[in-house]
């Protein structure tokens, strides 16, 4: 085969949200590339299967790039959440990335000076910014002059903090938009 390397764009949804979240920032909920996959959504399950299928093919080297929630100039989740009521997981940390960083990271992998360091790897790609969903979306609604979202404060919160330390170390990547 003439294909030597495959860069597969995946999602942090492959980790799932099965851990209850303690507001005291319990370190056991920090997710790295070594964390076992536990997808809960259909799309998360399909992405995990695709990752495994590509990684098991010895005809080429596959690098998996798992992006968090995407934010861009015309794309922001507050536009969907503004004015909604009973939103779950208010204390869960956000795990998002700006589209400028997505492009920077992809280019960083494709143009890396030492290809052996970046192929056959898995990288999480999430901005190092993890306020609670309630704090973040409330502030963004105010910033965009939108109706405040209302959160369900009665139920147990589930969530995770996804770390991109490996990406920053191996690629030497510095986030263009570290604060979203």
What residue ranges belong to the model's regions?
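NAD(P)-cofactor binding segment of oxidoreductase domains
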Residues: 1-9
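A short C-terminal helix-loop "cap" of Rossmann-like NAD(P)-dependent dehydrogenase/epimerase domains
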Residues: 81-89, 144-150
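Mid/C-terminal beta-alpha module of Rossmann-like enzyme folds, strongest
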Residues: 105-108, 112-164
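Substrate-positioning beta->alpha
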Residues: 64-70, 76-79, 87-110
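Catalytic helix-loop patch of NAD(P)-dependent Rossmann-fold dehydrogenases
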Residues: 19-64
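Amphipathic terminal alpha-helices
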Residues: 179-180
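Conserved catalytic-site region of short-chain dehydrogenase/reductase
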Residues: 9-20, 29-30, 39, 70-74
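Structural element of the ATP-grasp superfamily
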Residues: 54, 167-168
């Amino acid at each position: 085969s003439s294909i030597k390397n495959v860069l597969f764009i995946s999602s942090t949804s492959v980790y799932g949200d099965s851990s209850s979240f303690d507001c005291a920032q319990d370190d056991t909920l920090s997710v790295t590339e070594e964390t076992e996959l536990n997808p809960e959504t259909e799309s998360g399950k399909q992405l995990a299967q695709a990752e495994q299928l590509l990684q098991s093919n010895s005809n080429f080297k596959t690098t998996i790039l798992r992006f968090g929630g995407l934010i861009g100039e015309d794309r922001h989740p507050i536009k969907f959440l503004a004015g909604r009521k009973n939103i779950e997981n208010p204390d869960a940390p956000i795990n998002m990335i700006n589209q400028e960083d997505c492009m920077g990271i992809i280019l960083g992998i494709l143009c890396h000076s030492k290809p052996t360091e970046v192929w056959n790897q898995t990288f999480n790609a999430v901005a190092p910014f993890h306020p609670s969903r309630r704090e973040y979306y409330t502030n963004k609604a105010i910033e965009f002059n939108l109706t405040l979202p209302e959160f369900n404060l009665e139920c147990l919160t589930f969530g995770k903090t996804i770390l991109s330390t490996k990406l920053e170390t191996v690629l030497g990547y510095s986030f263009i938009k570290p604060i979203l």
